[in-house]
From Swiss-Prot:
Name of the gene: rplS
Family named by the database record: Belongs to the bacterial ribosomal protein bL19 family.
GO CC annotation: cytosolic large ribosomal subunit
Function noted in UniProt: This protein is located at the 30S-50S ribosomal subunit interface and may play a role in the structure and function of the aminoacyl-tRNA binding site.
Gene3D superfamilies from the UniProt entry: 2.30.30.790
PANTHER family, per the entry: LARGE RIBOSOMAL SUBUNIT PROTEIN BL19M (PTHR15680:SF9), RIBOSOMAL PROTEIN L19 (PTHR15680)
InterPro entries (UniProt xref): Ribosomal_bL19, Ribosomal_bL19_CS, Ribosomal_bL19_sf, Translation_prot_SH3-like_sf
An MF annotation (GO) of this entry: structural constituent of ribosome
Source species: Lactobacillus delbrueckii subsp. bulgaricus (strain ATCC 11842 / DSM 20081 / BCRC 10696 / JCM 1002 / NBRC 13953 / NCIMB 11778 / NCTC 12712 / WDCM 00102 / Lb 14)
Pfam families associated with the record: Ribosomal_L19
UniProt keyword terms in alphabetical order: Ribonucleoprotein, Ribosomal protein
Name this polypeptide is given: Large ribosomal subunit protein bL19
NCBIfam families documented for this protein: rplS_bact
Amino acid sequence: MDPLIQELTKEQLRDDMPEFRAGDTVRVHVRVVEGTHERIQIFEGVVIKKRGTGIGATYTVRKIASGVGVERTFPVNTPRVAKVEVIRHGRVRRAKLYYLRTRSGKAARITERRR
């Protein structure tokens, strides 16, 4: 890759992101702009996938809201995300947890990883 492009992308990368993987439960603090007012909205759920590296990396978080599954994909390096907190580390044997979409209730549980 061109050194100039590498230098520009390195400036854009965030260094305040915690380490998390698929199966971890995270709390994402998202900045929401409503007119002239800006507030923080919290989206808490299980990380079902992480994709890519560098500036284009994304992760998808899934939660159940009012009995309906909601998935939201966030870029890792976006300024719209104020912070990410890792609530618990889950023990899974897959990198992509798409099977959670078909499961509900106790079948969708993920055991906690021992540290």
